[in-house]
């Protein structure tokens, strides 16, 4: 398996050149993507999606597209077509947990136009579970009957909380940076201060503030090591953001002093 790491340096964009280089003709069978991208909440363009499909089609590669944050685009005009709708060997993976907020239902589904894949996927399912919970199926049906109402409500929360998060990022632009998310309810924020995201997470945990440091997503040391994920899809997020802001206010001058000292040392090298 070849993993292609995305980078904040280009806004977490998929490099088609790297994908092409990773393909081993005749050996590569699947391309697995995460779109919208978790943890950064970014989206590829429709042109990139079409070029990716053309590349996969050239080598007869199945694209498995994790679309669990689809339908939570902050602007509906940015929404990409489901992979299953635009590629003959595309598979779209969806769950109840993200756009509908049905985390406890533990129900999801795969959509694909190639019926020859059906039995293969059913066989794979049996490695994890013999059958889904009937109670979860009934709950999922109830939620989906009210889908439009639930999505509208959740998007209202997401958009409001994102506005607050943007204000936070503007206020502390010298301490934090990001690629502004355009879909989903998560953002991947870079901490510019004098510690790793893991160390920051440990300090925040002592104040009952939870973030997801970079090591939760990769054990490799990359240019995202200082990044951490935050969620902004819940009604209680403004309270959590206020607590984070109070923590930053308490420490910001010491951080800035350490950052100036670090820059001074680098300038002497």
Please report, for each region that a protein language model flagged, where it lies by residue.
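Active-site phosphate-binding strand-loop segment of PLP-dependent enzymes
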Residues: 6-78
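Helix C-cap/helix->beta junction micro-motif
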Residues: 58-59, 172, 207, 251
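Conserved core segment of the aminotransferase class I/II
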Residues: 85-159, 166, 255-257
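Conserved glycine-rich beta-strand-loop-beta hairpin in the small C-terminal domain of fold type I
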Residues: 141, 157-166, 177-190
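Conserved C-terminal alpha-helix-loop-beta "cap" of PLP-dependent enzymes
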Residues: 176-177, 189-229, 234
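PLP-dependent enzyme catalytic core of the Aspartate aminotransferase-like
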Residues: 206-207, 219-269
């Amino acid at each position: 398996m070849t993993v292609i790491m995305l980078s904040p340096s280009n806004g977490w964009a998929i490099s088609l050149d790297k994908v092409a280089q990773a393909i081993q003709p005749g050996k590569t069978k699947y391309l697995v993507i995460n779109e919208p991208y978790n943890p950064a909440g970014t989206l590829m363009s429709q042109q990139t999606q079409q070029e990716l499909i053309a590349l996969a089609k050239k080598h007869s590669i199945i694209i498995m597209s994790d679309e669990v944050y689809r339908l939570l685009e902050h602007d509906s005009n940015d929404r990409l077509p489901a992979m299953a709708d635009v590629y003959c060997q595309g598979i779209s993976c969806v769950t109840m947990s993200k756009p509908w907020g049905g985390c406890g239902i533990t129900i999801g589904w795969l959509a694909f136009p190639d019926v020859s894949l059906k039995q293969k996927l059913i066989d794979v399912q049996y490695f994890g579970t013999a059958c889904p919970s009937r109670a979860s199926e009934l709950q999922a049906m109830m939620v989906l009957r009210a889908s439009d109402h639930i999505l509208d409500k959740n998007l209202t929360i997401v958009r409001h909380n994102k506005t607050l998060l943007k204000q936070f990022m503007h206020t502390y632009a010298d301490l934090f940076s990001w690629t502004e998310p355009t879909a989903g309810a998560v953002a991947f924020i870079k901490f510019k201060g004098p510690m790793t995201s893991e160390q920051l997470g440990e300090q925040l945990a002592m104040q009952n503030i939870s973030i997801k440091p970079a090591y939760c997503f990769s054990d490799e040391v990359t240019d995202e090591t200082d990044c951490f994920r935050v969620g902004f899809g819940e009604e209680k997020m403004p309270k959590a953001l206020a607590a984070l802001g109070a923590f930053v206010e308490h420490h910001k001058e010491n951080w800035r002093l350490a950052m100036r000292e670090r820059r001074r040392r680098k300038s002497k090298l």
